[in-house]
Amino acid sequence: YSEFLTFDSKNPDAHSRDRVVLSVGHTCMLLYTILYLSDVLEMEDLKSFRQIDSRTPGHPEIETPGVDANAGPLGQGVGMGIGMAVAETMLQKDNVHYTYILVGDGDLQEPIALGAASLAGHWNLSRLIMFYDKNDIQIAGETNRCDSTDYAQLFESMKWDVQEINGHDHNEIRNAIKKAKEVDK
């Protein structure tokens, strides 16, 4: 957030912000922690995680300041994030915003995600950055039991700029974001 995103913690829903969509809604504590460290949420919000009427439900909801999209069925966040990127491209003459989407294995097994991704590649949405957490597991178990898709190859065929990195290495993540912002694709 602090190094790459356009985000004002005093106005977390400002129109001029970058968008972040967690298609993997169960990872919302990561977002809530960042919002807490950015002074958007309070410790009491984190302590009430997954409680009824909490500002920190078990999947993100837009009623929480700083949350850009509700999480729903697998793959929905991919379509929502791509839709945001399309809208920003169409509505802004000098589009300076980025849309970031975090997806997992289960998301990419859903046709809604792949259809939206194909459209994004076709339309060359260059201000869209998607992180794919390929850990070879989804809710039903290991992905090799039900899926043998080479997603890097598939996304390259859909005209995406694909970078495969170690997601635990901050420098690799940093360099990948910098490179993604330089590529017009």
Task: Please describe what each predicted stretch is.
Residues 28, 42-46, 125, 148:
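Alpha-helix initiation and N-capping motif
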Residues 6-7, 43-63, 91:
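Acidic-glycine-rich active-site phosphate/pyrophosphate-binding loop
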Residues 25, 54, 167:
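Residues that form or immediately flank small-molecule/cofactor binding pockets and catalytic motifs
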Residues 36, 51-54, 182:
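Generic surface-pattern signal
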Residues 32, 46-50, 174:
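Generic detector of well-ordered alpha-helical segments enriched in charged/polar residues
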Residues 9, 17, 60-185:
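Glycine-rich ThDP/TPP pyrophosphate-binding loop and its adjacent helix/strand module
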Residues 1-36:
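N-terminal amphipathic, basic-rich helices that act as targeting or association modules
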